[in-house]
Every structure is written in structure tokens, then in C-alpha cells.
Amino acid sequence: MKKKCIAMLLAGGQGSRLRSLTTNIAKPAVPFGGKYRIIDFTLSNCTNSGIDTVGVLTQYQPLLLHSYIGIGSAWDLDRRNGGVTVLPPYSVSSGVKWYEGTANAVYQNINYIEQYNPDYVLVLSGDHIYKMDYQHMLDYHIAKQADVTISVIEVPWEEASRFGIMNTNEEMEIVEFAEKPAEPKSNLASMGIYIFNWPLLKQYLQIDNANPHSSHDFGKDVIPMLLREKKRPFAYPFEGYWKDVGTVKSLWEANMDLLDENNELDLFDRSWRIYSVNPNQPPQYISPEAEVSDSLVNEGCVVEGTVERSVLFQGVRIGKGAVVKESVIMPGAAVSEGAYVERAIVTPDSIIPPHSSVCPEDADDVVLVTAEWLKQSNEETARKDEA
């Protein structure tokens, strides 16, 4: 069945800067915002934008992500024609061919794309937090008669060297692209969101794949090649909320952003819902002794202590006399009686011991509490007690 536009969602990244949060799961599967996973935002954007055919390309630690996505029913993508399809690397006659870059991942799934004979292909990343109407971007792409359109956002000049940076003319046509430049000429950063005319994308994926010196990456190889060959690349300016949650600190910041009174993400906006898999937990319980303010408290939580400006995921327990401030407590974790937690991300199923304290040594830092961190902390406490 022919589709005007289909999406290819890149979800195979490890996210090593998130440290132990991605030891056993892919970055797009990391919990976020009390009840979601990072990939929920991109999948929900597709649903809300009317993109009903999505290929999800997975590779690193994919099992939980595959189980979570299932047949796509949580995002209304369980369709007979189209819907969501998980696309891990697979074995061919020459052996298993791992994805070797973002462009190579799409190249290896040309047959999947061809069955829909699309006019346009939307390439997405599954590891950013944002809301976007992709239909508006597609309309812009068509109006500009572009070969490729790249969504861009203005970033602070001091951070521009961390991104792929676009230089454009007055018509927003891209005249120069630099990947993480030491001296950026612009602060228009690529968001890793592309719309290509499918015939042209197919042609250049094949050219790139045949180049043994290519890293097979859209930003490093394919886009510069299009510029060299004088194609029509345009930048699509995006002005909403967008966060690259690639570090522990940025993940914590994005969760805290949700608690701002006028935050741009607004999880309660019924006109642009963020869908997720229902955890099937009982209602949360807030005891008479508890004090909760400026926080997100999800299903299945039991709160008997004090919670201030924090995000509690499903099944979290906060004991009597415990205090939690500016923290993210992930699914199934517990803060025991009398414990104190501030500016921390507590990983799933971790248990903070009674009357212990968790807070960063540097006031601007964030503590990532894991089983290994707790073990080391307990050993240090035991040594101090012995002394």
C-alpha cells in the first residue's frame, strides 16, 4: 500500500554517557517523566502528526524496547496497513550485518521502505524529549521544493560546538554544514530530524554504502555529500521545547523542567497527548503524615514522608520521616524511613537505606544512585563505624 510519508526511527543507541542507566537497556527505553520512556515522545509525535507507518531500528540491548513497543497499540500504531515495525539487524547469506551508522541502518532496510513506495521518508531519533508536528515540517519541505529538510533549533553560542551546525541564507537554504565545529559560524543546531525525497535518499544511501571510507552517518557523510553536489537542503526552524537527554545531568534537568509552572512540554495538554504503556498499578497512596509539593507522583506509589519538587515513577515507596527533594525516583525504588535524598536520580528497584543521606558533594551536580553506588556507600559507612 502506497504511503505519502513513512518514518524511520533510529533507536539503537547505547547512550554511554548515561552510565549505568543504559547498562541493560537502550537509551530510548530509559524511564522519563514519571510514567514514560524516552521513545514515547517520538512515537507520540508520529501518532499526533498523522504518521501511521513507523520503522523502529534497534540494535543495542533491544529486548526491553522490543517488549515495550510490542505491536504499537499504546500509540495507536497497531495497523493492518503500516503501523509500527521493529527492525533489528538480521542475518543474510553472508552472515549477520550489524548497523554501522545512522545512514547504514536505514540503507539496510530499503526493502522495508520500498514496500510502501513513499514520496517522503522522515528520519527520526528516539532519544530526545520534545513535541513536534511533523506534518508542518513536511508541508514546509514540499513548499520549499527541498531535496532534504533538517529541523534546527537555536542553541546557546557557548554550546554550539557540541552540535552539527547549519549556516543558511535568507531563504533558510543550507549553504554550509559543520559537525561539532571548534569555531561555529551559526547557532542553528541540527535536531537529528530529516525529511528526504525518497528517490533521492535511496540513491545517496546506495552511494554512501559503496564508499569504504564513509562512517555511514547522516550528519557526517550523507548531508555533506548532498551539499557538495548542490542539492536543495533546507533548515526548518523549531521553536518549542527540545532536550538532548544524553547525560545524567541533562536527564535530571529535563525531569525538573516538567515541574515548572509554565513548562513548554506540558504533559497535561490534551491536544497533544504523550502516550505510553500503562503500568497497571493501583492508585497512589499519600498518608496523613506525608507532605507532597510541586511533584509528579505516579500510580502505585506509597508516600509517607516529605516529597518536594520531585518525580516519582510507578511503585515507588517513600518511608516515614524520609525527605526527597529535587530528585527523580525511578520505578520500584524505595527511600526508607528517615533517609534524606536531594538532587539525585535513583535507578529502578534501588533501595535507599534507613536514615542514610544522598546528596552531591558539589551543589550543582547530580547523584546517580545505583546498586553499585549503594554498595560502596554502605561499605564506607561500615568502615567509619568501625573506626
Swiss-Prot record:
Reactions mediated catalytically: alpha-D-glucose 1-phosphate + ATP + H(+) = ADP-alpha-D-glucose + diphosphate
EC top class named in words: transferase
UniProt organism field: Geobacillus stearothermophilus (Bacillus stearothermophilus)
Protein name: Glucose-1-phosphate adenylyltransferase
Function text: Involved in the biosynthesis of ADP-glucose, a building block required for the elongation reactions to produce glycogen. Catalyzes the reaction between ATP and alpha-D-glucose 1-phosphate (G1P) to produce pyrophosphate and ADP-Glc.
Known pathway: Glycan biosynthesis; glycogen biosynthesis
Tagged with keyword Nucleotidyltransferase: yes
CDD domains for the chain: ADP_Glucose_PP, LbH_G1P_AT_C
GO BP: glycogen biosynthetic process
Origin: domain of life: Bacteria
Lineage: Bacteria, Bacillati, Bacillota, Bacilli, Bacillales
